[in-house]
Amino acid sequence: MSIYRLNRLFNPESGRALDVAVDHGFFGERSFLTGIENMAAVVHALVAANPDAVQLTLGHARLLQAVRGKHKPALVLRSDVANVYGNPLDEHLFSHHVPNAIEEAVRLDAVAICANLMQLPGRPEIREANIRSIMALRAEATTYAMPLMIEPLVMQDNAAGGGYMVDGDTDKIMTLVRQARELGADLIKADPRMMSRTITR
């Protein structure tokens, strides 16, 4: 992991990082696009708001990195895609990472890459796919000194809607956070309110 990249991610005064994710189009769900239809305008607004980082996909990362000047948010690159958010769900679920995600992150001058670690009821194959992706990304991230951010997501059945919703069970999330660290996460992406509870337990 490169401390030099992390120096561009974390606020030097607070030691914290606000990473605004607008990578939702990657997952192929129409409902995720509300408010982010015009990505050039979205990125322009975020640069003006000046969070610590903006999380983008391969297709839109250049919108941020094309902005001139020193004072702009850092780039966190989304490295994986899945179809587990549908309502109703597709018959076949998948989760894959971009094969050359680390090299792309280096070329795009990202400060970190982000990958999911998901727990879905009755779908252990998705967690297995995530773990395979994380292990592959970890090996290449080490070679290029690219910080690896893992986003633990615990989901619950949405029986009425036919899909999954986020499960706020702290014990389940804590288990995934621990597993993410054991798999080599340099960074954990989470709601700060939930994170304080999982870290202190």
Describe the residue ranges of each PLM region:
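N-terminal basic/disordered segments at the start of proteins
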Residues: 1-12, 18
